[in-house]
Amino acid sequence: MSKYDFKKIEKKWQNYWDKHKTYKVNEDPNVPKEKRIYILDMFPYPSANGLHVGHPEGYTATDILTRYKLLNGFNVLHPMGFDSFGLPAENYAIQTGKHPKKITEKNIEKFKEQIKALGFAYDWDREIKTHDVNYYKWTQWIFLQLYKKGLAYTKEIPVWYCPDLGTVLANEEVIQTPDGPRSERGFHKVERKPLRQWLLKITKYAERLIRDLEEVDWPDSVKEMQKNWIGKSTGVEIEFLIKESKEKIKVFTTRPDTIFGVTYLVLAPEHPMVDKITKDELKPIISKYKDKEILKSDLERTSLEKDKTGIFTGAYAINPITKEEIPIWIGSYILGTYGTGAVMSVPAHDERDFEFAKKYNLPIKQVVSQTGTNEVLIKPFTENGISINTPTEFNNLKTIEVKTKVIKWLIENKMGQEKVNYKLRDWIFSRQRYWGEPIPILFDDNLNEIPLNDDELPLTLPDIENYKPSGTGESPLSKIKDWVNVKRNGKIYKRETNTMPQWAGSCWYYIRYLDPHNKKEFANKEKINYWMPVDLYIGGAEHSVLHLLYARFWHKVLYDLGYVNTKEPFRKLINQGMITSFAYQDENGILIPNDEVEKKDNKFFSKKNNKELKQIIAKMSKSLKNIINPDDIIKEYGADSMRIYEMFMGPLTDSKPWNTQGLIGIFRFLNKIWLIKNKELTNETPPKEIISELHKTIKKVTEDIETLNFNTAISTLMIFINELLKHEKNYLKIFRPISIILSPFAPHLGEELWEFMGEQSSIFKNAKWPKYDLNSIIDDTREIVLQVNGKTKDKIMIKKDTDEETLKKIAFNNQKIIQNINNKQIIKIITVKDKLVNIVAK
């Protein structure tokens, strides 16, 4: 009897797939569009740490679906590549003195080795790397299309600059401290510095970016996050005349009905009117206040938890309707980049205004109430209601009626207009860094922009030794004079020395996969029409806003220019849940690294002081040393075991804790299949009850794969394998279809079983997904409840009259039960035939 030698089997089939290019995409144009599917993973950034077990979760899900579709005769596009430009590689290069290109390419080789070890069905001939010159040539080309369409422009804007590091920092690299902002790296002082930056006019697409979310099958949470990020508000822009001046201040509000309760205006410290209206005697103190506030991040200034600060300018504005004089303040919580950079403050009906008014003893006038009568305000009334304390024609009306009348009055008197506002800002698209795509623009002596011609692309990143920051806030490229200075028609021009952000390459990579070796265009139009849109896109929820929003923006521009055929790039989106790990906490709530923890008598203790620790679920991190390396898992249990375990842990979209005990159960499951393979293979007709169970299994697994419920599909397979083990013979008419439906989950074992049955080529080239026959199904299943201490943790379907021992095994192999009894003492197990298993534990 042979042993399940997973190492030998997995190596054998990985070599076979590579040699025969088993997963090379079919380019036959005669394959109809309805029989094609584009399945895509969010491609990884190749960090020096390599993969941990969380990465393959999404990759395994797409791989199962890919193999299932191949077995159903589909033409499947399932590529992989690397998001290889970006800040982490450059920072690591600066720290180590190694070139970012060498670091990146070494990391990619490690990633590929790990990915291939898991047996994923990628067409590696389509691999892309965003730092590859043949790729970023087309990133530059797309930038030029944006530029020609008027969607790319330069502007001087304030950025974080660190004099000690000699470089500009991203918001994420700056820490706010009581002593002011500091760099995350080195804890150096940072300052706001105006620098010329490239921006992309994503704001031009704000409305479409909201509207077209209705056309995609995405999680509601992601749609809501994008809508909130774009931040659409419908309201009125109102003009307030400044007393003793012809100047006006424009404010935007969604509640024009509250204009009667305005008791002051607040301007952003950076508002252009501040210097014009401030009284001379107040200018020194206001200048000092401005300098302090603009050093803060937008998040810090607008945080509800932060104290609101402000200062009076000495100037007054006139309420356009009531003609009341109202003081003009500047306040930290108003941003110059949102709306008009000024607000009309109605403290009776806005939380921030209420807090500010209380702090500075400003009037609070109620003009809306729930009942239509004056009330004592302990907190602002922010709901709709009945107007009070307003001119007669506006008084005692519902909010919606007052809004309508106020808007009409403002428009008729040319003091306001209806307007839609968005929180979304234009995308800052330049970085003062080396490791990114060079921007294909030249400047003359007058800083006029000259875009490169298409035949001048790619503008290659010079291979330099000194890629450290320039020390002036400029990119390291600014130091390469023979690269920066370009002679044209006898004149000297200067290249743009900023580079593109990491997001650039990931904005369009899904298109390049369609035609990765095309040297004439970014992708062939026929191939775009054939494959797009991406049918299923799987990746982490952390990309819900930036990557997905930027990719949608670029896609819409390409759609408007006629280069792509769909309004949206990704038809269906799934966010896989996070795979977490155990961590350990002391009595003060401090997390202790795993290598400082020891287990004694099912309890956990600190190695340093022998104090007992609490086991909790936490995100995998280097500092906690609770990262699980897939290489170790594959070495001990095999890739097929790891793949199945990650899918069996729970629903794809749920967060789940890693537990090696569950993995051992999966390994045993695969060994059971091998035991069946070792039985006498026969062409005899199987008993009716086995045929019935087979068709039930095919039906359930088919339905579960289609709906991405992989955990229940695996559970169904386990139940059927346990049933087959009871029989002395291995029936070919059963083993053949069961090997096929197993193969998407355990492709190496599936191939081995296929070959064992006498087949010569890959199961994914030669097999067809079995069809179930409803007439063959005998309904003898029962739903049972799995409980811990009397509380239901799961419900599963089992065969009627399942014996007590099998029930117990099913319960103890159930992932939800494992999670709830982990490190607990089992007191007793209660089973009720065909109804429940209750595990009593403490």
From Swiss-Prot:
InterPro entries in the cross-refs: aa-tRNA-synth_I_CS, aa-tRNA-synth_Ia, Leu-tRNA-ligase, Leu_tRNA-synth_edit, M/V/L/I-tRNA-synth_anticd-bd, Methionyl/Leucyl_tRNA_Synth, Rossmann-like_a/b/a_fold, tRNAsynth_Ia_anticodon-bd
One GO BP on record is: leucyl-tRNA aminoacylation
MF terms in GO: aminoacyl-tRNA deacylase activity; ATP binding; leucine-tRNA ligase activity
Query: Which keywords fit this entry according to its UniProt record?
Result: Aminoacyl-tRNA synthetase, ATP-binding, Cytoplasm, Ligase, Nucleotide-binding, Protein biosynthesis
Q: What subcellular locations does the record give? A: Cytoplasm
Positions occupied by motif 'KMSKS' region: 619-623
The record lists ATP as bound by: K622
**Which superkingdom is the protein from?**
Bacteria
Catalyses which reaction(s): tRNA(Leu) + L-leucine + ATP = L-leucyl-tRNA(Leu) + AMP + diphosphate
Question: One Gene Ontology cellular component annotation?
Answer: cytosol
**In which family does this protein belong, per the annotation?**
Belongs to the class-I aminoacyl-tRNA synthetase family.
> Under which name does UniProt file this protein?
Leucine--tRNA ligase
Identify the species of origin: Borrelia duttonii (strain Ly)
